[in-house]
Amino acid sequence: MVPAGVDPAAFDAFDMQALDAGTFDAAIDGAGDALAVVFFWGVDCFNCEIAKKAMLAQSDAIRALDLKWFHCNVYEHHQLGRRFGLHGVPTWFFFHRGKRLGRATGWHGLAQFQAAVSAARAKAAAAAIR
């Protein structure tokens, strides 16, 4: 559930599943072979709103990345912020088969986000070869 006053458009557009400490591990494991990404955000976070708007403005390119999306309000779920050592939001963590592959901190444009996704896919591919 999204708190009152938070625009859910990006969460809805990318079919992001909300996570908390109780659902996190099972949801990430349940993503299976998909490259999963968790969007960590906070209420009244200006940069989070900028990121969501930018993602919506380039929604076709974001969808083309073929990600399984999740989101977590770390202002509400502090334990996940601590677990992942977050010092600021927005932050995206990438997972494959339950393994953390990397992160992107701050929205620095589509090209940088695409590069982070590519790096995560390369790590997933390298792990599959071993």
PLM feature spans:
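Short hydrophobic/charged patches on amphipathic alpha-helices used for structural packing
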Residues: 25, 78-81
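N-terminal leader/targeting and pre-domain segments
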Residues: 1-34, 116-130
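A short glycine-leucine-enriched loop at secondary-structure breakpoints
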Residues: 83-87
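Short active-site neighborhood of thiol/selenol oxidoreductases, capturing the structured segment around
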Residues: 31-44
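Non-catalytic, surface beta->alpha helical segment in thiol-disulfide oxidoreductase systems
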Residues: 88, 93-130
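The canonical Cys-X-X-Cys-His
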Residues: 45-48, 92
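Typically the conserved alpha-helix immediately C-terminal to a functionally engaged Cys/Sec
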Residues: 49-63
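Thiol-based oxidoreductase modules, predominantly thioredoxin-like and allied folds used
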Residues: 16-19, 40, 59, 63-79
